[in-house]
Amino acid sequence: MKKINRKHKDSVFVDLFANDIYAKENFISLYNALHKTNLDPKTTEVKPVMLENVLYMSYYNDISMLVDGKIIVLIEHQSTVNQNMPFRFLEYISRIYEKITTEEDRFGKKLVKLPIPEFYVFYNGVENYPSESELKLSDAFLIPEEKHNLKNNDFKLEITAKIININVEKDNPILHQCEPLKQYSDFIKEVRDCMKENIENPFTTAINRSIKNGVLSEYLKRKSTEVHNMLFGEYDYETDIRVQRREAFEDGVEEG
């Protein structure tokens, strides 16, 4: 699987499932866990269709792959789940369709066949979020009072995002069906534990402990420096987000 070169930093999640030399095997393992299939990474074609400039900050946490007639879009969230994810996915998939089709396709009379989109958010933040849930684009629709009894299937446009909590404590079944995802979740827990201990070099310690415990050990031995730098970027990002939210809250309190 060809490595994606993008201008900003990728997260460890993206590197593990989209860029690393074993990313294809890891991604197929995750795909099989999501779909209860048994695709063989050696014979299954996987085509990256990731986009540039989808985030305003300094690193990427999105993966989009064309596989088995589907476009699988994965987002990792380490902070509060954004309730506007279906809207963001709508924008995202529109740009992907534009990317994989030609102008002639879009304006020609012949029907253009499009891969089926699927949207997943993998949550591993610290809030007590359900093991699995869904967000729908229709939840954001402005519905007149007299039509509040509309059902979801009454809407002409819908995007459904499946939210999967991959924190080890939630013990989501997918963690037992995809070993790379399970080890990634174990690693992130180790990172958080080291940060709570106020260790001078928490990322280095987390990497060393994980290698010792057999968690992503081959990957971490091979890419310890890169992983350290990715973690630094990710948690710097999370700090920035928390600061922005706190400042926005304080501004709101001051304004009354």
Where are these regions (language model features)?
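Elongated, amphipathic alpha-helical interaction scaffolds
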Residues: M1-E255
